[in-house]
């Protein structure tokens, strides 16, 4: 994009901030659905956030797919600005160095000021992709509103009409019906461009909005993020009434954990298949069992959408629930004799505390769970066995089972929902982890996670596990999905064995203890250096080479590369202020005396010479006056005159 010519110098666009600003994450990861269900309907909410105050300026919700849910967003300029146009004070010690604007008459504190904002142009600069900006132009960071130089602006309402071919949004003024400005009278209209509709909204995208005026242009920072949720909220299925009411543990300040001197012994070999009716003499260790869940998730995700596994983090959640169910519509088998899947039914009642979606229901479903049913069957008479398709389970009121008996179902007035079972493995873009480990000031934001269930939900319905596929791709996806199912089956068997050891305890106490055991398993992996501990998740780095086992070394390597790239983009003068936290104060303290001393050395000799010359001239005049007073002037006589 060519830089427009403006009457204002570019130095006016640079403020005296010297700290980098990083924003945490609050949004929902962009969902890449599997091929069988590209038309899945979600509740999509677009949120515009005022970064200065960390408040929500606007939220727009709609029902639609992830391809067409891009509505026109409306927000008021004063919701992005506040009472006064002021920059963010990233460091409280920066206030005394001029980090605030001296003028505050450009805010929205009064009605007159709101009207005044309508007369000033504004321009917007993106901060989500600095590498796509104009070549040879340093657009700065959040402290500059990403507009440190002309040519960085991509949209706005100004006389030079800033445009861009690569930015995600356009921001223009809307029409206001409130001429008195008693309410909101500075409407802005935000629309998504074609590039924005194709972008991966895996986190909040930030922009800087600057008011075009004389002097420094004030800054307002805002983010646009997308939140995706299912239409029906998840509900608990199972006999345990304690788990649905459990809340996540309170977040405490994260302290540095000690690294174990020895790495945990892990079994590098792939998990062997276990017969349904017999248990192998050797059970794989806890570390291998959890890593196999992540490995199977990676293989299934890579087979369905390789673009998602090009560069990502797969995280095991350390808080319950550890599995979630997606209700589906499937063709179950009705048999008079119990199939092999019925023989491997768990001996204990396992509760799935999160079931979402709509699918096939069997039995008398109460009103509290009818939202999970797309199709309901009352059941069959006689001693029939209903076996769930491969890769699916029946989530019943009495627990999780791959097969249900109609005789028991009719006798107990139970009900079941056909579900896909997925481990609670969350998917994150690499930026999510790097921003948490980077040593920079940032706002605290709650992460929004995309679980594998949302990304691969409906996979069995599409025919990968339940149906018969043709071609190499179908066979490959079937193998990868079965490996994930084998890892889940092994993990569920281990959980069931743990419950058997506590069978004399209360059911609720047993499952709570089991959940604490999973939390200890996650800590075990963290102490061994296999995972990057991030809040309440255990993250494993993955790319097209597969799952990386030594994650901490990989994380340190990539953080070092990012730091080198960041340092290379900084100017030599800007880099001084990042070397030490007290360097800014030292420079500002001694810069004044140094400048005065330099001016004295440059202009002192010239001023001194002129002063000496002036004194000499005055002395010469005084000496001449003294000499003339000692003598009398002789009168001249003209002899020709009488």
Curated annotation (Swiss-Prot):
Stretches the record annotates as Fusion peptide: 448-468
Organism expressing this protein natively: Feline leukemia virus (strain A/Glasgow-1)
InterPro entries: FMuLV_rcpt-bd (IPR008981), TLV/ENV_coat_polyprotein (IPR018154)
Position of sequence motif CXXC: 312-315
Protein name: Envelope glycoprotein
GO biological process, one term: symbiont entry into host cell
Domain of life: Viruses
Coiled-coil stretches noted in the UniProt entry, renumbered to this chain: 476-525, 535-571
Cellular component, GO annotation: host cell plasma membrane; membrane; viral envelope; virion membrane
Region feature (Immunosuppression): 514-530
Gene name of the record: env
Residue span of motif CX6CC: 531-539
Subunit and partners: The mature envelope protein (Env) consists of a trimer of SU-TM heterodimers attached by a labile interchain disulfide bond.
UniProt note: domains: The 17 amino acids long immunosuppressive region is present in many retroviral envelope proteins. Synthetic peptides derived from this relatively conserved sequence inhibit immune function in vitro and in vivo.
